[in-house]
Amino acid sequence: MAELDPFGAPAGAPGGPALGNGVAGAGEEDPAAAFLAQQESEIAGIENDEAFAILDGGAPGRATRRAAGGPDAVDGVMNGEYYQESNGPTDSYAAISEVDRLQSEPESIRKWREEQTERLEALDANSRKQEAEWKEKAIKELEEWYARQDEQLQKTKANNRVADEAFYKQPFADLIGYVAAEEAFVNDIDESSPGTEWERVARLCDFNPKSSKQAKDVSRMRSVLISLKQAPLVH
């Protein structure tokens, strides 16, 4: 008795004529067998495409996984996103982040750079603070120097006034003044030039008209000396 296939067709001998419903049909193709062969061919092609995609580093598509019809057709989908069971990145963004992580600087270098930045900022702040302190100190010292100079000048003026008053109050002050003028005249002789003789003579005279120490009227002599000083005689 011949064996029957799942669709009720008797299984013929390999290479023999196909029989349908007990009737021999030489050259007639079984539609069920052709359909199964076509499905197997498509499944084999899909599996080959998935294999090539995985080798290229890509994840199999959602439609492709569902078309395969296997029990793990939806294993690669979670919360609307694809994931890959391997250790590699799932997409280009993950790959970029992975490269950045691998190429990122070590923790020690990052800490050293942060410490250097903080140290430079502290040095800049300290330099600005010291500069402000030096400027303030320099201004203060300059003001103190000007104050000391002014005080010394006032003291010098006061001492000079006291010395002048004491000199003129002492006896023979006029004589001392004449002697000093004569000494100055003698010192100028060596350095004199022609035509300045009367000018040197005028230095020895007191031309103050209000002087009360003069017992005689010397106004005429005073006028003569002044005229000779202004217009010396020509030899």
Swiss-Prot record:
Q: Which GO terms describe its molecular function?
A: structural molecule activity
Q: Tell me which UniProt keywords the record has, alphabetically.
A: Acetylation, Calcium, Cell cycle, Cell division, Coated pit, Cytoplasm, Cytoplasmic vesicle, Cytoskeleton, Membrane, Mitosis, Phosphoprotein
Disulphide linkage map: none
Q: Which GO terms describe its biological process?
A: cell division; intracellular protein transport; vesicle-mediated transport
Q: Where are the stretches annotated Disordered?
A: 1-32
**InterPro entries linked to this entry:** Clathrin_L-chain
Phosphoserine occurs at S104, S193, S223
| N6-acetyllysine PTM sites in chain numbering | K210, K229
Bilayer topology annotation:
Peripheral membrane protein
Q: Which domain of life is it from?
A: Eukaryota
- Per the record, a Pfam family? Clathrin_lg_ch
Oligomer status and interactors: Clathrin coats are formed from molecules containing 3 heavy chains and 3 light chains. Interacts with CALY; the interaction stimulates clathrin self-assembly and clathrin-mediated endocytosis. Interacts with CKAP5 and TACC3 forming the TACC3/ch-TOG/clathrin complex located at spindle inter-microtubules bridges; the complex implicates clathrin triskelions.
What's the stated role of this polypeptide? Clathrin is the major protein of the polyhedral coat of coated pits and vesicles. Acts as a component of the TACC3/ch-TOG/clathrin complex proposed to contribute to stabilization of kinetochore fibers of the mitotic spindle by acting as inter-microtubule bridge.
Q: Which family does it belong to?
A: Belongs to the clathrin light chain family.
Its recorded name reads Clathrin light chain A
Q: Which organism is it from?
A: Mus musculus (Mouse)
